[in-house]
């Protein structure tokens, strides 16, 4: 029977890990006792195989951290890798077997009104109302809005909400019920995720935004883009953010003229986003043709689903992470994966 993690982090001096055991979801907080290695006549060697090492065990993460702080620069310390990866290496010594059908993937997209001052709705300000959200989970679609709408497909459900607070509350409740291991969508890392967390924090409360995490915590961070610009995003602890545009760039090894969802869907699926050119902008579409506006929101989510049905990039990413014995998001980078591979070999 398969037992494997989907996300493992260090938090509050413990290892927080979630995953599946024989298809059943588990969540554990582990009081981890790490080890380090020192030069000595022991049974271990460094990666070159030339330096003999002896193992030194500690009673807690804090004790090991204090030891490193005290003796760094005094003598060589080996095996100083982040503790979540050491825990994974010790818990899964052999090859990790997983079942991708277990892994809960929540694919979503939000729409917003125009800000009161006009212009683009920036995620860090989140000063425009969220007026529609669609979630795709396990090939079922759930759309939240405040107007009247009739679903066009049997696997689509529309949830009419009283107002924006009701919409966001119901969205978070469904998210929590699904308990996703992975979230995806198009440009969600730098738009949808920071926007929705900042908006929930602003009009409901930061505590309610924390409900998006199975560990009850979302953490704001600024990330430098390729052009050196800093953008806000969030770590939703326990949930892997696998933005599909990012993994598309990482794993397809082709250069596209544009990485908009419209262009990539056309290149890969010979299909485009829903056309609303008869209306000046999305706000006018929302005001004048609500049915088409919701169709547009659903279509964006459908396109991401169909892209992965064709390309299977999420499964490729899972496979790579389990080969390396790291977290899913680590595979999007490079250095962390190699650090973990070196540690395990």
Q: Model regions: which residues?
A:
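Common nucleic-acid-contacting/processivity interface regions adjacent to the catalytic cores
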Residues: 279-345
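Extended acidic/polar, glycine-enriched regions
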Residues: 48-103, 157
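Active-site-proximal helix-loop-helix substrate-binding element of RNase H-like nuclease domains
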Residues: 143-144, 151-158, 162, 179, ...
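Short catalytic/ligand-binding loop motif for oxyanion handling, primarily in non-cytosolic enzymes
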Residues: 115-116, 190-195
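Conserved RNase H-like, two-metal-ion catalytic cores of nucleic-acid enzymes
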Residues: 3-10, 14-46, 88, 92-182
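Extended, Lys/Arg-enriched charged tracts that mediate electrostatic binding to polyanionic substrates
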Residues: 97-117, 212-234, 343-345
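Short secondary-structure boundary/capping segments
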Residues: 122-124, 194-207, 335-337
């Amino acid at each position: 029977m398969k037992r494997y993690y989907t996300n493992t982090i260090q938090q509050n001096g413990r290892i927080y890990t979630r995953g599946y055991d024989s298809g059943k979801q588990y969540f554990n907080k582990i009081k981890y006792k790490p080890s380090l290695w020192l030069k000595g006549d022991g049974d271990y060697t460094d990666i070159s195989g030339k330096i003999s090492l002896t193992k030194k065990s500690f009673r807690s993460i804090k004790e090991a951290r204090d030891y490193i702080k005290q003796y760094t620069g005094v003598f060589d310390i080996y095996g100083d890798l982040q503790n979540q990866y050491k825990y994974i290496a010790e818990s899964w010594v052999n090859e990790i077997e997983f079942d991708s059908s277990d892994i809960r993937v929540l694919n979503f997209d939000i729409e917003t009104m125009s800000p009161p001052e006009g212009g683009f709705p920036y995620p860090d300000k989140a000063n425009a109302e969220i007026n529609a959200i669609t979630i795709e989970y396990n090939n079922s679609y759930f759309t939240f809005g405040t107007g009247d709408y009739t679903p066009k497909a049997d696997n689509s459900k529309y949830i009419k909400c009283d107002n924006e607070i009701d919409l966001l509350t119901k969205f978070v409740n469904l998210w929590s019920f699904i308990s996703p291991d992975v979230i995806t969508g198009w440009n969600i890392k730098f738009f949808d995720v920071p926007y929705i967390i900042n908006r929930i924090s602003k009009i409901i409360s930061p505590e309610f935004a924390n409900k998006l995490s199975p560990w009850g915590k979302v953490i704001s961070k600024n990330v430098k883009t390729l052009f050196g610009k800093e953008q806000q995003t969030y770590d939703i602890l326990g949930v892997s953010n696998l933005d599909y545009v990012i993994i598309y760039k990482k794993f397809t090894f082709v250069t596209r003229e544009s990485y908009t969802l419209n262009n990539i869907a056309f290149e890969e699926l010979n299909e485009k986003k829903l056309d609303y050119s008869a209306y000046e902008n999305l706000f006018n579409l929302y005001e004048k043709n609500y049915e088409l506006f919701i169709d547009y929101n659903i279509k964006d989510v459908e396109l991401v689903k169909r892209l992965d049905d064709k390309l299977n990039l999420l499964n490729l990413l899972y496979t790579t992470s389990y080969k390396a014995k790291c977290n899913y998001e680590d595979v999007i980078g490079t250095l962390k994966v190699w650090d973990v591979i070196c540690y395990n070999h």
